[in-house]
Every structure is written in structure tokens, then in C-alpha cells.
Amino acid sequence: MAAALLLVACARPYVSPLAPPPHRDEITAGYDAAWAAIVRALAKENVALRAIARDSGVIASDDFVAPIGVYADCGRIGDDLLEGEALVSFTLFVEPNGTHTNVQINSRMRTHMYRRGGSGKFRPTPVFQCASTGRFEANLLDTVRELVRH
């Protein structure tokens, strides 16, 4: 019993990252051109789609694996950042706004295989929630803007 209490007392707390709000942006193109560019940009990134509904403006990706730190911030345990892989998915909401198109990107992320810091064995559990770094969203919308220009 004393050993268990000592182990718990020495355990470092998990510090989760602050979740950012959904990424919102405006594309300076009509809905049809923006929609086509978004679909092409997702295909260029090789993102598998679970659902795509042009009439309602919703695109949902399947979960895909990404290195922690690229698209996902998974926090830390004590002073050690979590490293490894995260499962990430995105849902895009696209709606016309006159001659422009509004896009909102929601993200969902969790650890897949991780370790504390740069050493140790990778493990799948416990699963920790992660927050978006904003990199996927920014890169995707940059690609969309480039595609609507051409």
C-alpha cells in the first residue's frame, strides 16, 4: 500500500494543450469554384474522406495518422512533451457568402502511439486528447487559394 501511494505521489500530471476555436476563413471565390478547389486540395494531401455532401457544404475526413507536433499538440506529462503519432480528423463546413465562400474547419485529435519525451517505449494507452496546431488548416486553405487563382 505504501509503495502504491509513493508511486502516485511521484507521478507527474498530464497537462493538456488548450484547444483553439474552429478555424474560420473566407475564400475569395464563388461556392462552386471554392468547393472544387477544397476537394482537389484534400485529394492532393491524400486525405481519405468519410463523407462529402456538396448540397449541405459538409466534408468529413476519416481518421488519419500524423506525427505529434505537426498537426496535433498532445500536451505533456510533467516537463516532457508527448511524442509519436496522433489520430486526426477534420470536418469542413463550406457556405456561400455572396461572391465569396466561408469555410470553417473543426478538428478532432487524440494520441495513437506515443511516449514521454525523446525516449521510452511507444504505447497506445492511455489515450490523451490533442489540440490542432493550425498547420493543416492553414496549409489546406493556402492550397485552396492557389487553386482558385488558376
List the predicted regions and their residue ranges:
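Sec-dependent signal peptide recognition
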Residues: M1-A3
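C-terminal motif of bacterial Sec signal peptides marking the signal peptidase cleavage site
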Residues: L6-A9
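Ser/Thr-rich, low-complexity intrinsically disordered terminal regions
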Residues: A11-H150
